[in-house]
From Swiss-Prot:
The keyword Hydrolase applies. It comes from Shewanella oneidensis (strain ATCC 700550 / JCM 31522 / CIP 106686 / LMG 19005 / NCIMB 14063 / MR-1). Gene3D superfamilies: L-arginine/glycine Amidinotransferase, Chain A (3.75.10.10). This is Putative agmatine deiminase. The lineage of its organism: Bacteria, Pseudomonadati, Pseudomonadota, Gammaproteobacteria, Alteromonadales. It comes from the Bacteria.
Length: 370
């Protein structure tokens, strides 16, 4: 266990000025970060089920990549008993456990030096549809993770969650208008201004804008639940053939965008379709385990935004969520076809979905760099 409480004074330049860029997720990684789940108003049984699931995710990742986990001081003793011994526990306050969205985006240069981008965070919408209050501890998470690694920090003047962007490492950024252009994120900025900031801080030059994310995704349609890059020139899209499903028009519109765009290198995209699980719904028993608080209520019968696209690529291993016995094997087979050189590892992940996300949402990779 390590303790981090270090102020990393932000740099006054921007990554693109300094020759830094965000690498693709398939680039070599030195670590993956996660955060301990404990909110009783988001996780049933005060997080007990989620904690057991997170431990399985740690094991699945840990076979390929070292895992760090931020844990508030009050929960360190329990974390030591629940989590595998190979995880590095780091004392760290947080309001919840979404490392993808509160953690830093680590950028690298040609020499392999790593630095981090610390984005603004307002709990997916602030006082206009945000998911909980306060979020002041989450605002400090990225800084603490960067301090753990000794990385210099850029402070970006933009509210942005890591789950709202995907990059191919070759100049292309994919995102959704539903999230990035939402009035509850950066209402004072135009689309062009947001693109300008992403160019500055990710060092990208081409944007693929999908309109919407997954139906009922409470993050306002994060791209990491809807579509991701498999490699340069290839994407994986969340899909259903059921034209009566509310997801169908969203996925169909996304497919049309993807079919009619090119990436930063001028390539037409190869598009893989990953089937939708379910549909899946929150049960009465599952909703009863969540207490009332400042978090979004968990209601019985509510549709869950389940998606197999919400997987992590880490050092030639794909860690993906098992969500529905009817489609889990189909998803695994499809992922193996897309990633023939990777090991495909499924983890039962319904408990993460009940909290509003999945495996990609609760992880944040640190590129290998040097």
């Amino acid at each position: 266990m390590t303790n981090v409480n270090v102020d990393v004074t932000p740099l006054t330049t921007k990554p693109s000025q300094d020759g830094f860029y965000m690498p693709a997720e398939w680039a070599a990684q030195q670590a993956v970060w996660m955060i301990w789940p404990y909110r009783p108003d988001n996780w049933r049984a005060a997080g007990a089920y989620a904690q057991a699931t997170f431990a399985k995710v740690v094991d699945a990742i840990g076979a390929a990549t070292p895992v760090y986990m931020g844990v508030p001081k009050a929960f360190l003793a329990k974390a030591k008993t629940v989590m595998p011994s190979h995880v590095t526990l780091v004392e760290m306050d947080s309001n919840d456990c979404w490392a993808r969205d509160t953690g830093p985006t680590v950028v690298v240069n040609a020499e392999g030096e790593c630095r981090g981008v610390d984005w603004g965070f307002n709990a997916w919408g602030g006082h206009n549809g945000g998911l909980y209050f306060p979020w002041d501890k989450d605002e400090q998470v990225a800084q603490q993770m960067l301090a753990q690694h000794g990385f210099a920090r850029y402070r970006a003047p933009l509210i942005l969650e890591g789950g709202s962007i995907h990059v191919d490492g070759e100049g292309t950024c994919m995102t959704s208008a539903e999230c990035l252009l939402n009035a509850n994120r950066n209402p004072e900025l135009t689309k062009e201004q947001i693109e300008g900031l992403l160019r500055d801080y990710l060092n990208v030059k081409q944007f693929i804008w999908l309109q919407d994310g997954v139906y009922m995704d409470e993050t306002d349609g994060h791209i990491d639940n809807m579509c991701c890059f498999a490699r340069p020139g290839e994407v994986i899209l969340h899909w259903t053939d059921d034209e009566s499903d509310p997801q169908y028009p969203r996925s169909k519109a996304a497919l049309e965008v993807l079919q009619n765009t090119v990436d930063a290198q001028g390539r037409k995209l190869k598009i893989h379709l990953l089937p939708q699980p379910g549909p899946l719904y929150c049960s009465e028993e599952e909703s009863k385990g969540v207490t009332e608080g400042t978090g979004v209520p968990r209601t019985a019968g509510e549709r869950l935004a389940g998606s197999y696209v919400n997987f992590l690529i880490t050092n030639h291993r794909i860690v993906f969520p098992l969500l529905d016995p009817a489609t889990d094997d189909i998803a695994a087979q499809k992922l193996q076809e897309i990633f023939p050189e990777h090991e495909i590892v499924g983890v039962p992940a319904r408990e993460i979905l009940l909290g509003g996300g999945n495996i990609h949402c609760i992880t944040q990779q640190i590129p290998a760099g040097k």
